[in-house]
């Protein structure tokens, strides 16, 4: 079964980045996915909640792309190079999705500092000990 756009109010992947949906997304991920309550949440908990909310939006776009590839019987050519490190992903993904301002406003209205959350992300390593 191919997933479709969520309309259940939980994953918020219908393409519109409303402030209220994003705030509900943060709260949902915090409570149901991470199992923490806002009163005892750490910066890492908030980072994960925001990241999972963003990931859900990216996942829907990925699914839509893969569906298009299947329908058109497309061919894919891939090139993998581990010589270039992209750095932290959250900030880049917010910009690429075009939802940075909406996430920033939703975070502010939820009493969170988006820049502090973005800065919390660790630099991903290459994995080769270097």
Tell what function each PLM region has.
Residues 1-130:
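A conserved ligand/cofactor-binding region detector
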């Amino acid at each position: 079964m191919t997933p479709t756009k969520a309309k259940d109010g939980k994953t918020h992947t219908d393409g519109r980045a409303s402030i209220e949906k994003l705030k509900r997304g943060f709260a949902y991920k915090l409570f149901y996915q991470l199992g923490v309550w806002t009163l005892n949440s750490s910066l890492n908990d908030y980072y994960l909640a925001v990241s999972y909310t963003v990931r859900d939006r990216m996942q829907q776009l990925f699914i839509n792309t893969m569906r298009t590839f299947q329908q058109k019987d497309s061919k894919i050519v891939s090139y993998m190079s581990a010589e270039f490190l992209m750095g932290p992903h959250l900030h880049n993904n917010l910009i690429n999705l075009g939802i940075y301002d909406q996430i920033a406003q939703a975070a502010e209205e939820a009493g969170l500092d988006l820049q502090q959350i973005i800065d919390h992300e660790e630099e991903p390593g290459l994995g080769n000990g270097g």
